[in-house]
Amino acid sequence: MYICRNHPLAKQKSISFEQLQKYPCLSFDQGDNVSFYFSEEILSTNEYPRIIRTNDRATMLNLMVGLNGYTLCSGIICEELNGDDYVAVPYEDANNPNSTMEIGYITRKDNTLSKMGTLYVQELNDYLQQESKKMQQR
């Protein structure tokens, strides 16, 4: 889950659903015709006491800072692009067993990725390994 660096829960090793109840959940709205299977957030069908939907990433990032909001998204918040005002904290919740998200890509059967596609996937894997190490050091 992503929150701003100054959020009261930012230094936690992990965060549960109960700990988030008093903060607004920020959801990225991709429109009415998008299946929840393609949602960028885990637990997108949960009921939240306070939820703000936006279709603009800059607005979402500003609301994280201004309102101590959070998002349970799969999006990568890249420090080089967005600054270091945001942190990822593991979301762990025994009451929500579907709180992990698998991210992948789809290719046509019997096709291989292009050189550019292979490079892109490798860069993503490298980035995720770096971020995983950062989270383990917390």
Give the location of each predicted region.
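A residue-level structural signature of the nucleotidyltransferase/glycosyltransferase Rossmann-like core
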Residues: 18, 52, 69-70
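Non-transmembrane alpha-helical segments in soluble domains
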Residues: 61-64, 121, 125
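Short glycine-/acidic-enriched loop or helix-start segments at secondary-structure transitions
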Residues: 12, 37-38, 81-83, 117
